């Protein structure tokens, strides 16, 4: 099994993260709003957070990024994106399983939001035991998902 590790982002990762976002999420974004390169790049520039986001590496290759917020009552998975060339290899499952274990150990829920049309991601989250809580956004474009809280 290929080792999966995380490293903090640096300013040098800005373009990698934008291109990753385009490859991993571009189809969903285009289906919902249409892909506007300038608007997406401006949004990315506002949100890019070196040192807080983490780069996912598999076998020493940068394959994705993850952003996790540790809140007082929950762990919130703000973003996980894996390049399509590396999807389906268990990388996301391993990272999500580790977050679910950490949430259980803390006595907290893992919470995330996912595009409603992203059926593949929703199926993965459900397979790992997360449940859909509530759709939201204009036209219910996203759904909040939550793990069942289990105390250690």
Predicted regions and their residues:
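Conserved acetyl-CoA-binding loop-helix of GNAT-fold acetyltransferases
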Residues: 82, 88-101, 123-127
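Conserved beta-strand-loop-alpha-helix junction that forms the acyl-donor binding cleft
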Residues: 84-87, 111-122, 137-146
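Conserved GNAT-fold acetyl-CoA-binding loop/helix
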Residues: 25-45
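Conserved active-site tyrosine of GNAT-family acetyltransferases
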Residues: 44, 125, 130
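A short helix-loop-beta-strand connector motif used in the catalytic cores of GNAT acetyltransferases and
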Residues: 45-55, 64
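A short beta-loop-alpha structural element at the N-terminal edge
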Residues: 4-19
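Conserved beta-strand in the GNAT
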Residues: 61-69, 76-81
